[in-house]
Amino acid sequence: MASQGCVDWQFSGSDAAEKAAQASLGTYSSEIFSLCDPQGKPILPPLSEEAETSHTAEKAVVKAVLCGTGNAYAPSIGLPVAKRAVAEYLNRDLDNKLTGDDVYMTVGCKQAIELAVSILAKPKANILLPRPGFPWDMVHSIYKHLEVRRYEFIPERDFEIDFNSVREMVDENTFAIFIINPHNPNGNYYTEAHLKQLATLARELGIMVVSDEVYRWSVFGSNPFVPMGKFSSIVPVITLGSISKGWIVPGWRTGWLALHDLNGVFRSTKVLKAAKEFLEITSKPPTVIQAAIPTILEKTPQDFFEKRGIFLKDKVDFGYSKLKNIPTLTCYMKPESCTFLWTKLDPLHFVDIEDDHDFCRKLAKEENLVVLPGIAFGQNNWLRHSIDMETPRLEDAFERLKSFCERHSVIVEASSLKDVNGVN
């Protein structure tokens, strides 16, 4: 048997992995859920409960399994039929049409983010990310040793991008601005005029736009969704998407990256070549789901998305009305997309709450209610509330939230805080 004496091992865990994990939404989510009591009142939102997907999507996957069309390895850049189907689907909203060659299939939108960051990263480079924003962009930027610069929003103007903050932080090493549209966690989505302003500014600054559009099927506002790819005649655009949110199938792990490049900039700057090379050395999305993609995208009835939108709008209206009775939290706008409410927390309104992280930890311990802290999205003292529950559970969740805030608050009367949106 080998000696068990002291050995100077020449390996250790990655510091980059530890730093990236600290920025991960999953790290915060796991921590908060772990503080709940499984023997107490029902944990809200329920763990691992998902709404029902489209029967068309289910049947498409079953057919792919039974026919064997998804049994083999797919090309590293994706099945040609899946790539063409995505291009044709996106082309419904585009003047400058895509082909299958412009689309790369990925393992969900997360790998699409990783791909976008990896193929563009260079020494000393920096990228503009939203504050707040979904943290996967931050995680992968940390791994690639990119400098992250956070641009701001204007809450009082329905969370429009603060273009002044963008202009101020760009230098010769900035290569892209990353947007989330529709936005998680703000719950807004951008008008055509605002996106055109962004494209014009990006062109002026010499940077590309990367747009995460995974929530495009979860829009329930009065205005139509406008994809960033519509402005590829002004600036090179990369759009990211997947079926996870629109079809409520995050476990199917299938997404894409699309290059909108009317003027051939991606080819001349070797972005196309880098994308193909990156995908040669990474995992591929399930072939069986790729084989089903054409039917999923083409045949899913529109009323599936309409019913989902009605459900989400109803829950947003309900949750927003309940927040009016919790004066310690401020909701600047009623969301028009996604599945969350985003509220500002002022610790000065509480007796014993230090910040958003402390709020969420204590809420989980006392009420078995999971709300995620804004720090998980890069913004201190904000909270993200899930509304993707049936009404009885949602009512229970907001009653628990209200009780918790009343116990810890220095504010007694609900009327003592101004409602920034008025009665709605």
Curated annotation (Swiss-Prot):
Q: Which InterPro entries match?
A: Aminotransferase_I/II_large (IPR004839), PyrdxlP-dep_Trfase (IPR015424), PyrdxlP-dep_Trfase_major (IPR015421), PyrdxlP-dep_Trfase_small (IPR015422), TyrNic_aminoTrfase (IPR005958)
Question: In the Enzyme Commission scheme, what number(s) does this protein have?
Answer: 2.6.1.-
Reported cofactor(s) = pyridoxal 5'-phosphate
Q: Which UniProt keywords apply?
A: Aminotransferase, Pyridoxal phosphate, Transferase
Record SUPFAM superfamilies: PLP-dependent transferases
Top EC category: transferase
The Gene Ontology biological process terms listed for this entry are:
amino acid metabolic process; biosynthetic process
Q: Does the keyword Transferase apply?
A: yes
GO molecular function terms noted in the UniProt entry: pyridoxal phosphate binding; transaminase activity
What Pfam families would the database entry show? Aminotran_1_2 (PF00155)
Describe the family membership recorded for this protein in Swiss-Prot or TrEMBL.
Belongs to the class-I pyridoxal-phosphate-dependent aminotransferase family.
Name of the protein in its database record: Probable aminotransferase TAT4
